[in-house]
Amino acid sequence: FYAAILCLLAFIVLINFNLFTILLALASMPLAFTYPLMKRYTYWPQLFLGVTFNYGLILAWTSISGSLNPVPIIFYIGAIFWTLGYDTIYGYQDIKDDEIIGLKSTSIKFKNNAKKFLSLCYFFLIIFFLIGGYYMNFDYIYFGILVIPFIHLFIFQINKFRINDPKICLKIFKSNNIFGLIVFINILIVKNL
């Protein structure tokens, strides 16, 4: 019942966008409906979540511009790497239960190389956000402020991460709202200068 109400509300919002955005949003529906099943079939459900969850970035861009160019795709790919990292961390909270019932995840796949995998995810996040900022012609303020959340990722998250400590994993996972907020405020600042 609630799913039907939410779908109806989403549809009401959706019809207010331009046709291109509506078509892109409808094209994303298979992603949204199949994501919950991914842990049964692949070790990459976090990647699938990143592709699905961050699709809103593309929709936001097209709803404003009416078109699609490489810039939002660059930020989209960076955001996918971010989700891949933070949701892998989240997955370590219940990794033992997932293994017992036969579910799959990047947390399980990379449990012996977790910090390396997370570092790689965050490295590519940084690269894509830097490239995106360059193509948006953001000035030095964007790149300077961006150092703060990137330090947070590597100094706090990677350094403090403990695969067998669910409380630390949850704390690190939740700290991603700080990362996102700083990046968001940073973009607002440079776009309004």
Features from the language model and the residues they span:
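Multi-pass membrane catalytic core of lipid/isoprenoid biosynthesis enzymes
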Residues: 1-26, 81, 100-143
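Juxtamembrane helix-entry segments on the extracytoplasmic side of multipass membrane proteins
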Residues: 66-76, 137-144
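Cytosolic, membrane-interface loops and tails of multi-pass inner-membrane proteins
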Residues: 3, 87-111, 159-168
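Alpha-helical transmembrane segments of multi-pass membrane proteins
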Residues: 32-35, 78-83, 90, 149-156
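Intramembrane alpha-helical segments
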Residues: 1-74, 131, 153-163, 167, ...
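Extended hydrophobic alpha-helices typical of membrane-associated regions
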Residues: 127, 131-193
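Membrane-interface module
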Residues: 73-105, 116, 192-193
